[in-house]
């Protein structure tokens, strides 16, 4: 049975569904959520999933976002008297899943909270009231009766340090919270249409799970010790039932590829201080676009200094988030270990975390410079609440760092192509275009020549977009942009401008005549023609995305003029 409330003005709804024996999903549907965490440019909203399991005793797995407080508790109390709930299982303490824990404990103070040791510690700081607790370790079990025996899997860093999975042996359902989820809002409970959801599934992995690929593989190994998993009840998006093996297999493949990366960058910061998590995640997103592996270390957690020393030694680059000035001795010890383990061949980037009490950034930056490290991007200084542009700046800074540490590899790859084949590929020619895009307050642009019409009905074309281009994150499925066509004999000024290497966060359109298209993207005043377009699909082509888009509007400024053509002599670069 599925029940769905009427959609409110803000398009926040609650859906309940019986998903297995004695098991009800309570899904908080946020239809218009256009951003989540950092770089999720959502087109399809998101959901926050909670689950009620009734054995001889009753357990609730996770709660919801605080914005759903009234809707969630109206729904929960319609299903059960909260005082009848025996256990609240906390998958992790991120506010979008635990935002209503304090309210629930006030309604039902006899509930026993079940979670990892770290989760219980975090929760004490969130609820500020005594509560019953049960700390679980990997392999521990909780018997609700009537066959509902829960087994717990410790899965740290997916994507919070306190994460656990919970497996119900009776229904063979694995509750994973963020892992295997996606930001996709639909009243279709399960993964029935894989083709529709897989772009969001992949993008979610890239943003949140990819930077913790080793932790993903560890969790998958522990999952392998469980009996067959029939369903994965995720914290976001549709539940996995029809494609469990396929989608867990993709996680394994993607994570194995990440850990095989020839180069890696260490990202070090104090989680849950200021905006550190969000800023670090944006930088990580930029790094991973370059194909570089990432090792994330929370300096606020227990850190083995020998392991830290070894990690720093094998990294080709480092990112440091400024810690609180009054930070614990363990954090200062970890920073001293990092400084004592670096070498002059490495690159470094530093960002303020905006916690209001950051250590000064310049003394630490000077120490790294004095040790001979290259500064890969200008220090990121946070003087006010970060905006979309701040996070875009962070992403671009991460990409700059990733490109710096892979520069030798890129040159080697260019030289590896046979001379004859290189020259033959160079005879493939294309027009010259500028892609412009704008989403919210963030805008970007890219010079392109790999553009080809792909269909008549609908009118569509393909563009090859390198994965490490700044504009790539603005060209997800559903995003809109403008294709500006450059004119033969009049393309040099625009081409020279957009070929410049822009600093992270720089305005690509400064000094360029533009006007806004209906979709908000800039139309270049000196372009020969323009087309307004929407991304329909993307195909992974190694170091590029082949982006197929449809065209719904366009104009030509000079009917007799021709498109500028880019003639190459070799095929190993643009």
From Swiss-Prot:
Record's keyword annotation contains Magnesium: no
Annotated segments matching region Flavodoxin-reductase-like: 410-574
Cofactor or coenzyme needed: Fe cation
One matching Pfam family: ODP
GO molecular function: FMN binding; metal ion binding; oxidoreductase activity, acting on the CH-NH group of donors, NAD or NADP as acceptor
Residues binding Fe cation 1, per UniProt: 92, 94, 159, 178
TM helices/strands, residue ranges: none
Keywords associated with the record: Electron transport, Iron, Metal-binding, Oxidoreductase, Transport
CDD domains for this protein: flavodiiron_proteins_MBL-fold (cd07709)
Similarity comment: In the N-terminal section; belongs to the zinc metallo-hydrolase group 3 family.
Disulfide bonds: none
Alphabetical list of InterPro entries matching this protein: Flavin_Rdtase-like_dom, Flavodoxin/NO_synth, Flavoprotein-like_sf, Metallo-B-lactamas, NADH_oxidoreductase_modular, ODP_dom, RibonucZ/Hydroxyglut_hydro, Split_barrel_FMN-bd
SMART domains: Flavin_Reduct, Lactamase_B
Region (Zinc metallo-hydrolase), start-end ranges: 43-236
Top-level taxon in the UniProt lineage: Bacteria
Protein's gene: dfa3
Top enzyme class: oxidoreductase
Natural source organism: Nostoc sp. (strain PCC 7120 / SAG 25.82 / UTEX 2576)
Misc note: By homology with NorV in E.coli, could be involved in nitric oxide detoxification.
Record protein name field: Putative diflavin flavoprotein A 3
Cofactor notes: Binds 2 iron ions per subunit.
Chain's role: Mediates electron transfer from NADH to oxygen, reducing it to water. This modular protein has 3 redox cofactors, in other organisms the same activity requires 2 or 3 proteins.
Residue ranges constituting the Flavodoxin-like domain according to the UniProt record: 265-409
EC numbers for this chain: 1.-.-.-
UniProt-listed Gene3D superfamilies: 3.40.50.360, Electron Transport, Fmn-binding Protein, Chain A, Ribonuclease Z/Hydroxyacylglutathione hydrolase-like
Residues where Fe cation 2 binds: 96, 178, 236
Keyword Iron applies: yes
């Amino acid at each position: 049975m599925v029940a769905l409330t009427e959609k409110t003005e803000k398009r926040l709804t609650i859906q309940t569904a019986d998903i297995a024996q004695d098991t009800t999903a309570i899904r908080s549907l946020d239809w218009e959520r256009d951003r989540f965490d950092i770089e999720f440019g959502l087109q399809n909203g998101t959901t926050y999933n909670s689950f009620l399991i009734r054995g001889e005793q009753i357990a609730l797995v996770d709660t919801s976002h605080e914005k759903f407080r009234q809707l969630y508790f109206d729904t929960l109390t319609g299903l059960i008297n909260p005082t009848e709930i025996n256990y609240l299982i906390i998958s992790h303490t991120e506010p979008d899943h635990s935002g209503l824990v304090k309210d629930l404990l006030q309604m039902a103070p006899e509930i026993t909270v079940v979670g990892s040791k770290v989760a219980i510690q975090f929760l004490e700081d969130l609820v500020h009231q005594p509560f019953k607790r049960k700390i679980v370790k990997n392999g521990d079990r909780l018997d609700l009766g009537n066959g509902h025996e829960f087994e717990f899997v410790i899965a740290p860093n997916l994507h919070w340090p306190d994460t656990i999975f919970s497996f119900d042996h009776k229904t063979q359902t694995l509750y994973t919270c963020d892992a295997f989820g996606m930001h996709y809002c639909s009243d279709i409970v399960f993964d029935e249409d894989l083709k529709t959801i897989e772009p969001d599934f992949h993008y979610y992995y890239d943003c949140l799970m990819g930077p913790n690929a080793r932790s993903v593989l560890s969790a998958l190994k522990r999952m392998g010790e469980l009996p067959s998993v029939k369903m994965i009840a995720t914290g976001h998006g549709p539940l996995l039932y029809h494609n469990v093996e396929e989608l867990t297999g993709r996680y394994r493949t993607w994570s194995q590829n990440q850990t095989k990366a020839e180069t890696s960058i260490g990202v070090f910061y104090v989680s849950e201080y200021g905006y550190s998590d969000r800023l670090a995640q944006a930088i990580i997103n930029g790094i991973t676009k370059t194909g570089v592996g990432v090792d994330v270390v929370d300096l606020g957690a227990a850190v083995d200094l020998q392991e830290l020393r070894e990690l720093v030694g094998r990294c080709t680059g480092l990112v440091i988030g400024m810690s609180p000035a009054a930070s614990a001795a363990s954090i200062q010890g970890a920073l001293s270990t990092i400084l004592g383990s670096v070498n002059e061949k490495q690159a470094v980037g530093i960002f303020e975390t905006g916690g209001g009490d950051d250590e000064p950034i310049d003394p630490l930056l000077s120490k790294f410079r004095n040790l001979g490290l290259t500064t890969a991007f200008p220090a990121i200084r946070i003087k006010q609440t970060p905006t979309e542009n701040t996070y875009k700046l962070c992403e671009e800074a991460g990409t700059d760092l990733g490109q710096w540490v892979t520069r030798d590899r890129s040159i080697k790859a260019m030289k590896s192509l046979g001379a004859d084949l290189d020259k033959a590929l160079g005879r493939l020619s294309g027009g010259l275009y500028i892609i412009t895009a704008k989403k919210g307050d963030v805008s970007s642009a890219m010079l392109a020549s790999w553009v080809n019409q792909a269909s008549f009905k609908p009118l569509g074309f393909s563009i090859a977009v390198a994965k490490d281009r700044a504009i790539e994150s603005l060209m997800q499925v559903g995003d809109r942009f403008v294709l500006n066509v450059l004119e033969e004999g009049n393309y040099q000024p625009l081409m020279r401008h957009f070929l410049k290497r822009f600093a992270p966060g720089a305005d690509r359109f400064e000094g360029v005549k533009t006007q806004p298209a209906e979709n908000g993207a800039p139309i270049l005043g000196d372009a020969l023609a323009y087309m307004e377009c929407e991304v329909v699909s993307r195909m992974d082509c190694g170091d590029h995305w082949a982006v197929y888009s449809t065209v719904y509007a366009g104009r030509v400024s000079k009917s007799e003029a021709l498109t500028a053509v880019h003639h190459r002599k070799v095929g190993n670069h643009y």
